[in-house]
């Protein structure tokens, strides 16, 4: 099987490197490791933090991007979320969804913002004017007053789910054909039938595979502080001391292998990231029958 090289728009780190804490050299080294894994482009994703720390890491990531072409921009997942669906995020650092608050950390290198659309106070329209991708996530509602969003962050996770009695973020994501949907198809974050429903309901060109990988991914660590919480990895999944499921402990090549063995993988899911971010397709990966990458041409 041949596919395009992988673009990952949602990962918090890997190999022990945390984008909320890492220095320039650490990020550059991680970029090289990800490239060896077949991931040619990625959007370092920042979890909720203080404005000061967030601004610092935006600057660090921008400087690292000057040294490696794989860093395509920043995905700001934190700060503008709904505490009801905070997940592993530290809600103490959440801020109201206003233009004024966004300007406290605004930077042209921020390319994706995850937010709770039901709490919007003018931020969505401003972000779209700046050509920033707006994604609904860690939320319980949908856009208001005719506003539009571009995508949905880790569909089904940290959002109001499917119900036959009331509207929800998940239902809106499935029914809106124009909206892209991220999904963590690692076999842990989304149950197989829910995944099949997503893949059957959404247009095939609107599904984006993501890992939401934690810094502990592909490291020898069994515990690590992430998003101000101590995360424990049991060899299969990572959770906080309270039992909250954190991000994935797999990278996208691992997830593609899982999907392939379930006969659920479509090469278009890789192509969609190029389309979403207007990136010119280039290069290829060659996979064997067991969904291992055997050749990289890029």
Language model features with spans:
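Divalent metal-dependent hydrolysis catalytic cores, especially in the metallo-beta-lactamase
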Residues: 11-15, 28-57, 70-82, 108-120, ...
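Residue-level marker for buried hydrophobic side chains located in beta-strands
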Residues: 5-7, 74, 134-136, 207-210
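Generic structural signal for well-ordered alpha-helices
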Residues: 31, 55-62, 102, 124, ...
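Short, well-structured alpha-helical segments that form the helix of a local strand-helix-strand
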Residues: 264-273
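Divalent metal-binding pocket/active-site signature
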Residues: 76, 83-168
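Active-site-adjacent C-terminal substructures of enzyme catalytic domains
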Residues: 143-264
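Di-metal (Zn2+ and/or Mg2+/Mn2+) metal-binding site signature of metallo-dependent hydrolases
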Residues: 2-24
């Amino acid at each position: 099987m041949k596919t395009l090289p992988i673009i990952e728009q949602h990962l918090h780190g890997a190999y022990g490197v945390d984008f909320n804490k890492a220095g320039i050299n650490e990020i550059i080294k991680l970029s090289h490791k990800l490239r060896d894994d077949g991931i040619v482009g990625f959007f370092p994703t920042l979890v909720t933090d203080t404005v000061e720390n967030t601004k610092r890491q935006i600057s660090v990531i921008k400087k690292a991007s000057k040294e490696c072409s794989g860093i395509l921009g920043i995905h700001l997942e934190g700060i503008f979320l709904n505490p009801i669906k905070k997940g592993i995020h530290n809600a103490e650092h959440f801020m109201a969804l206003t233009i004024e608050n966004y300007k406290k950390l605004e930077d042209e290198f921020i390319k994706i913002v995850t937010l709770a659309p039901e709490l919007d106070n003018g931020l969505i329209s401003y972000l779209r004017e700046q050509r920033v991708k707006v994604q609904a996530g860690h939320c319980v509602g949908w856009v208001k007053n005719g506003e539009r969003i571009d995508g949905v962050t880790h569909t089904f996770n940290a959002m109001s789910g499917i119900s036959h009695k009331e509207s929800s973020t998940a239902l809106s994501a499935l029914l809106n054909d124009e909206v892209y949907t991220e999904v963590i198809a690692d076999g842990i974050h989304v149950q197989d039938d829910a995944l099949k429903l997503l893949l059957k309901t959404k247009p095939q060109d609107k599904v984006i595979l993501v890992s939401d990988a934690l810094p502990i991914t592909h490291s020898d660590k069994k515990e690590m502080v992430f998003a101000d919480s101590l995360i424990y990895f049991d060899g299969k999944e990572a959770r906080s001391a309270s039992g909250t499921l954190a991000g994935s402990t797999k990278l996208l090549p691992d997830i593609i292998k899982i999907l392939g063995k379930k006969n659920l993988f479509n090469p278009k899911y890789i192509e969609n990231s190029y389309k979403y971010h207007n990136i010119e397709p280039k290069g290829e990966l060659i996979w064997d029958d067991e969904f291992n990458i055997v050749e990289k041409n890029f």
